[in-house]
Amino acid sequence: MRTHYCGDLRATDIEQTVTLFGWVDRRRDHGGVIFIDLRDRTGIVQIVSDPQRTPDSYPDAETLRNEYVVKIVGRVSQRPPESLNPKIPTGEVEIYANSIELLNGVNKQLPFVISSLEAELVREDVRLKYRYLDLRRDRMAKNLQLRHAVVKAMRRYLEDEQQFMEIETPILTRSTPEGARDYLVPSRANPGQWYALPQSPQLFKQLLMVAGCDRYYQIARCFRDEDLRADRQPEFTQLDMEMSFMSEEEILRLNEGLVCHIFKSVKNLDIPRPFPRLTYAKAMEKYGNDRPDTRFGLELVDVSDIVKDSGFKVFSEAVKTGGKVKILPVPGGNETISNVRIKPGGDLFREATEAGAKGIAYIRVKEDNKLDTIGAIKDNLTEDQKLELLARTGAKSGDLLLFGAGDTDTVNKSLSRLRLVIGEQLGLIDPEKINLLWITEFPMFEWNADEKRLEALHHPFTAPNPEDLDDLKTARAQAYDLVYNGVEVGGGSLRIYQKDVQEKVFATIGLSMEEAYNKFGFLLEAFEYGTPPHGGIAYGLDRLVMLLAGEDSIRDVIAFPKTQQASCLLTEAPATVDEKQLKELQVKSTYKPKTKEE
């Protein structure tokens, strides 16, 4: 029976006899004495087998190799002063092995080095194919432990301090497509009919509020068939919450308590409260996006009113057609950003054009407020307009002003992208800093140009601001997102709980009443039986843990993730299935593999 985990042994355990299990991380032979680094999920401890002091274990120690699985019984001893290792928590002690029992060996060559003391860069596809080995590595083991600690902290706060109940909602449900594509599951018992895997528990958690559950949470598995990127997976996990009889302010404050509890529990950090807040409109104005990284400045400045009547048509036409002209001021930019980088072929030019801009206009502020700029600006802006630009941006000698002009969306996207790139390149972003803020008052709807209709910016169950009910098309939503260092980690809203308002929202996004009742009739009927006011929020667990772990991809905080092609390299899923299975489901595939010529 195991008495201790490897990484838990300390000087206070000296003279104890312990039983350990684990993997051989490294084996070294120094002058006839064998040293073994024994590893389990908690860390490493040094094992010593000496032919003089521990003759019974020595023959077995000689046979050990990396990643052999062993049981070791031995006595905890103080390390000699010259071999103390302050780099590991167990560095004051070592175990003299009385016995070593080999439980299992390694019969094939390891695809990569696992030892935490011999760092090796391994291609991600190899790591994913041998994920069970990758997860033995110290970094990955710590990421999984951090994930567990975050979930544990969530549960303790919600259950012990806020009286939430954990309730499971169905995984097999009906398809109500709104946004990403559903994963569909054919029903054998009901031929021709299909389940969908849930994109979120949204409707069920609202029904739980109708049921009087009052405060619900769930560590929920969700599924979306969408194009993937570094922070997306086809199946992902979220902390899902819903609360009755709470105002938006009360929900935000409760969630600030939750987030602060998580940081204190897993990082021992005290996060100041209340968190800063920005409306959606203000975030777009100052940063060009609704999830700004506020660890650094470089705020955008709207100068549309100054240049709307200028002779420079790029500026004046942008404003006349309903667009914007904004400036990204870069203090000291004359020294750090060359013209080569701004002009075609340069990295900043490329960043801007990839975001939709046609190019970058600029002004360099020289001594005595003299301006170095492109001819079109120099010749077509009056002296007063130039001085107004300097005054509004606060620019001084040595500063660089980068312009975005055009439709508002493109200007915001391009300058927001440049802001992040320049902020990182100039070392303005402190990686140790933690900035959390709420974004509030989102628009209810956005225009879908492909389908030529309005669609819900969040989802169609979000409650509109009561002040805006007379004109839903331009209404603000009672919605809120939590942004952590420029990454959205949570989002929620107050919900519609009145049938007539829900019907109006469905109509606004182009759903006929027949279609609305076909898809959501069960929800609309529930609203006729005394539905309480309610609201909620969901946190992307994978994304939150990724940030807390300092990783760049959520794949590094998920035990068995999919690739960006939505495949599992370990199990080779997805895969074809037996024709018999398809016949039982009365499903036929029309897919034909492409020929080489195609």
UniProtKB/Swiss-Prot annotation:
Its EC number is 6.1.1.23. One of its GO terms (molecular function) is aspartate-tRNA(Asn) ligase activity. ATP binds at residues 224-226, 233, 488, 540-543. It catalyses: tRNA(Asx) + L-aspartate + ATP = L-aspartyl-tRNA(Asx) + AMP + diphosphate. The record marks 30 as: Important for tRNA non-discrimination. It comes from the Bacteria. Residues 202-205 are annotated as: Aspartate. Signal peptide: none annotated. Its main location: cytoplasm. It is an enzyme of class 6 (ligase). One of its GO terms (biological process) is aspartyl-tRNA aminoacylation. Belongs to the class-II aminoacyl-tRNA synthetase family. Type 1 subfamily. Homodimer. NCBIfam families: aspS_bact, PRK00476.1. This is Aspartate--tRNA(Asp/Asn) ligase.
